[in-house]
Amino acid sequence: MAATSAQHIGLQGHGTSRNDRDRRLVRYWLYAVFAVLIAIVMVGGATRMTGSGLSITEWKPIHGVIPPLNHAEWVEEFEKYQQIPQYQQINKGMSLAEFQYIFWWEWAHRLLARFVGFLVAVPLGFFWLTGRLKGGLKYRMLGLLALGGLQGAIGWWMVASGLSELTSVSQYRLAIHLTTACVIITAVFYIARGLVTYSERPAERSIQRFAGWIVFAVLVQIYLGGLVAGLHAGLTYNTWPLIDGAIIPSDLFTQAPWWRNLFENPKTVQFVHRMFAYTVLLLAILHAVQVWKNAPGTTHARRTIVLVGLVFIQAMIGIATLLMSAPLHLGLTHQFFALVVLAFAVAHWRATKGAYAA
């Protein structure tokens, strides 16, 4: 029976105390990875909002760790930036000091991305070799490591879209890059929360499924937010609750074929992001009603109230960001709170299932 339980959780231990200690170590490691991933996404958001994402025009996974160290190297790096359309059409005349400002944002974003790879790979090797990981958990972590490598490639694929013709990166690639980061965050936190001890029994299967769908809905909304960011769609329709005096504006489908508007028309993209925000809030409320009806007074039920509150707060931040035409501080706050909502939704989903078997 004990061997079966150990296989289910994917952790190897000699006795309960060793098993508990191993679970705790792995969980803390995953929390550290989670925190750095949040930092990467936030620095990435600042990089985007300050127009810094194209300041480094080459992808050097190893050598790129070292920034320019003297004036000549800075001039050389600046000259590379001066060859791309963003400089020639938007930032022409930028000083070296101004270039250094945007360079450091992109460099920090890339450095953190490299660091998280190290933070995953080295402890993973240690836990693996010392027998603290077994079975499914090993391969889940290898999958996360591979997904992280893919995310790095997606990041460069995104940057490359803005180096030849466009003056900014493709909104398609930006949204994919952001969403993939959030999928990784979801997976890391989900596994970590499966290693805690819960005092309450798992919820019924229908509640678990609904909780999972809410996580999916939040990820979809984050993808839509990536499209909004890539198209600077937050600078259109800066009114609420009506949209320039209408419930449904008349200029949502001005491009042909019609479906292109959903991805390329800033006004349509913002409209869809708005409407889906209401959908996420409605789903959270319906889920709370479901859980309070089927498991009243439980921790599961109380968590749904917190979830509704977080989604509501995020909606209010989004409205404020919209009304103020997306200033840097509010844009970053909106992005950070999206991650808060995602993390809590993931924690709730995992808790409805209970911990992995000991």
Swiss-Prot record:
Documented EC number(s): 1.17.99.9
Pathway info: Porphyrin-containing compound metabolism; heme A biosynthesis; heme A from heme O: step 1/1
One GO term (biological process): heme A biosynthetic process
Membrane protein topology class: Multi-pass membrane protein
GO annotations of cellular component type: plasma membrane
Enzyme category, top tier: oxidoreductase
Catalytic activity line of the entry: Fe(II)-heme o + 2 A + H2O = Fe(II)-heme a + 2 AH2
Localization terms from the record: Cell membrane
Family: Belongs to the COX15/CtaA family. Type 2 subfamily.
Protein name per the record: Heme A synthase
